[in-house]
């Protein structure tokens, strides 16, 4: 790709406001995204710990954390879109070029994210009554956490 082509990819209207506004909003929304990811990972780890415990207290915590983890994944996905859009506004031609060069990773992370989310729901469906019966299918929760961590590694590396 030549420099002339990169300049041609630039938006002719330019950035809609001062770039600092978009950089600050990008950092703010990324911080919110990371907070949701931390809630998701922490709730997932507590779910794994509590679901297979003999203690009723841990199982009750696991039931609550499973619901929290499920919701936190959705919140993390929604909050993860905004920083990407702010990056796209500020670094438009470079964003396009990097996505073309790493297209398989960009497309692959969406598929891995979907499979990780499905694995979380499979664990949820198998464990409607964790408190009484204990956890079942822990491999699904482990797979979900591993796949969601892989998504984070792909996107943020």
Task: Label every model-predicted segment.
Residues 29-37, 66-70, 106-109:
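Alpha-helical transmembrane segments of integral membrane proteins
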Residues 35-45, 112-116:
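Hydrophobic alpha-helical transmembrane segments
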Residues 37, 44, 70-73, 77:
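Residues within membrane-spanning alpha-helices of integral membrane proteins
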Residues 41-62:
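Membrane-interface helix-loop junction between the first two transmembrane segments
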Residues 72-141, 155-156:
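Membrane-interface helix-loop-helix modules in multi-pass inner-membrane proteins
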Residues 147-157:
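Long hydrophobic alpha-helical segments that form multi-pass transmembrane helix bundles
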């Amino acid at each position: 790709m030549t420099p002339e082509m990169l300049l041609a990819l630039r938006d002719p209207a330019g950035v809609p406001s001062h770039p600092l506004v978009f950089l600050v909003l990008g950092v703010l929304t990324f911080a919110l995204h990371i907070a949701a990811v931390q809630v998701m990972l922490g709730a997932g780890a507590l779910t794994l710990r509590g679901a297979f415990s003999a203690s009723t207290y841990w199982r009750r915590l696991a039931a609550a954390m499973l619901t929290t983890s499920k919701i936190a994944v959705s919140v993390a996905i929604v909050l993860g879109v905004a920083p990407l859009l702010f990056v796209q506004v500020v670094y438009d031609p470079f964003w396009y070029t990097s996505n073309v060069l790493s297209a398989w990773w960009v497309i692959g992370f969406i598929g891995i994210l979907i499979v990780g989310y499905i694995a979380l729901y499979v664990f949820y469906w198998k464990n409607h009554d964790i408190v009484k019966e204990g956890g079942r299918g822990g491999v699904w929760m482990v797979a979900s956490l591993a796949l969601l961590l892989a998504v984070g590694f792909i996107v943020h590396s």
